[in-house]
Amino acid sequence: MAATLTGSGIALGFSCSAKFSKRASSSSNRRCIKMSVSVEEKTKKFTLQKSEEAFNAAKNLMPGGVNSPVRAFKSVGGQPVVMDSAKGSRIRDIDGNEYIDYVGSWGPAIIGHADDEVLAALAETMKKGTSFGAPCLLENVLAEMVISAVPSIEMVRFVNSGTEACMGVLRLARAFTGKQKFIKFEGCYHGHANSFLVKAGSGVATLGLPDSPGVPKAATSDTLTAPYNDIAAVEKLFEANKGEIAAIILEPVVGNSGFITPKPEFIEGIRRITKDNGALLIFDEVMTGFRLAYGGAQEYFGITPDLTTLGKIIGGGLPVGAYGGRRDIMEMVAPAGPMYQAGTLSGNPLAMTAGIHTLKRLSQPGTYEYLDKITKELTNGILEAGKKTGHAMCGGYISGMFGFFFTEGPVYDFSDAKKSDTEKFGKFFRGMLEEGVYLAPSQFEAGFTSLAHTSEDIQFTIAAAEKVLSRL
């Protein structure tokens, strides 16, 4: 079966002769034009020959052939795919295969790839220069948008990645409280800084590593860990480390151990415990920020942390990160205060431009209702396909974020997630790839929908899932 929707889409009676289908080229165009399909398109064989050649060359140039481990397909097997272009809900590889994309550049592409308005705005900004190393007015605009949207943020500092945001916010929490220890949760990923690489999720979980060589013991000696959704374990840590804990940092919805939601009593309890013990609560919303709701997970759950990290969506697909929170805390950041942090490309005009135009689109009425609708349809459809074909599966969604596991469930923490049949997931992933659907190449990563995804995309994906599952 061809991975292009030109070939795979025959069952639905749709095809597209252009490089990208019309429904992929504009998020506002919700229709796919019915067209005739050539014999060549119908019989086109799925191949990754060019990807294989490119990847083999890359392995001599970059460690493992990639610049981020999960891209090497270590946990799913098969040939890593080398991508060429993307538009709307579609991504195309160098062999010409086109896929419905549920990775979305790992979250940023919430309005769809290569949005025309964002590209036009970037073109205008580039005429003025790509980076100044000095303040620009666009920083003010995006900062005002973030502050008005996110309940906890009264001041914000822009950086260049989610990792950098988490590094900065932890240093700030320690500076403000005068304490050194902090709590993170097993399977939660907060970037690759030394202090966080303890029982981490994301690519670390994908490779089956408890942590990373090269991290000094001293760097993690103040890192305390607890199982996610276990409030009793958190209380015990505070009891055993009285007056020493600066902060708790968590993904309010876990996306780096797969998709795991918090129990209501857990997230409420964390807020209470930090207040009672003079510790700060940090929400790592690099993934959930502007995705679960315009104000992020904190708006969705009605829990306001002291500090928040952001990334992905606020850069509209360009490298970006941010941390922000209460004014009295943020005023400790240099040059307003003594806590030093800096960056050559922080607040650069290109990332600010893409972020501004992405947030403008997300602020429109009906945005999150639409994301919720299509993601519900997708998640329920895949789980129903699993039920029909006799596979133990569980999963869930919130707005434009979803996930599923090959286990009976429920999944409340990383230890539950590890019960998933990862070998079966790998087979499912490879089968879906051949059917023209690109999922995250790891059982331990959440999936994402976008405003560019259509009902036809969702129905195609569900049909493909049932087809693949019936063969497993």
Curated annotation (Swiss-Prot):
GO biological process, alphabetically ordered: chlorophyll biosynthetic process; protoporphyrinogen IX biosynthetic process
UniProt keyword Coiled coil, yes or no: no
GO cellular component, one term: chloroplast
UniProt main location, coarse: plastid
This protein's pathway: Porphyrin-containing compound metabolism; protoporphyrin-IX biosynthesis; 5-aminolevulinate from L-glutamyl-tRNA(Glu): step 2/2; Porphyrin-containing compound metabolism; chlorophyll biosynthesis
Cofactor note: Can use both pyridoxamine 5'-phosphate (PMP) and pyridoxal 5'-phosphate (PLP) as cofactors.
One of the record's GO molecular function terms: glutamate-1-semialdehyde 2,1-aminomutase activity
Top EC class, one word: isomerase
EC number(s) reported in the record: 5.4.3.8
Keywords: Chlorophyll biosynthesis, Chloroplast, Isomerase, Plastid, Porphyrin biosynthesis, Pyridoxal phosphate, Transit peptide
Residue range covered by the transit peptide: 1-36
Catalysis performed (reactions): (S)-4-amino-5-oxopentanoate = 5-aminolevulinate
Disruption phenotype: Suppresses partially the ENF1 disruption pleiotropic developmental phenotypes, including the suppression of the abnormal patterning of the adaxial-abaxial-related gene expression in leaf primordia.
Modified residues (N6-(pyridoxal phosphate)lysine): K312
Residue intervals passing through the bilayer: none
Cofactor requirement: pyridoxal 5'-phosphate
Expression (tissue specificity): Expressed in leaf primordia and shoot apical meristems (SAM).
Disulfide bonds: none
Gene3D superfamilies: Aspartate Aminotransferase, domain 1 (3.90.1150.10), Type I PLP-dependent aspartate aminotransferase-like (Major domain) (3.40.640.10)
Localisation: Plastid, Chloroplast
Role according to the record: Transaminase converting glutamate 1-semialdehyde (GSA) to 5-aminolevulinate (ALA). Involved in the biosynthesis of tetrapyrroles.
Family the UniProt entry places it in: Belongs to the class-III pyridoxal-phosphate-dependent aminotransferase family. HemL subfamily.
PANTHER family: GLUTAMATE-1-SEMIALDEHYDE 2,1-AMINOMUTASE, GLUTAMATE-1-SEMIALDEHYDE 2,1-AMINOMUTASE 1, CHLOROPLASTIC-RELATED
Quaternary structure and partners: Homodimer.
Protein name as catalogued: Glutamate-1-semialdehyde 2,1-aminomutase 2, chloroplastic
Organism encoding this protein: Arabidopsis thaliana (Mouse-ear cress)
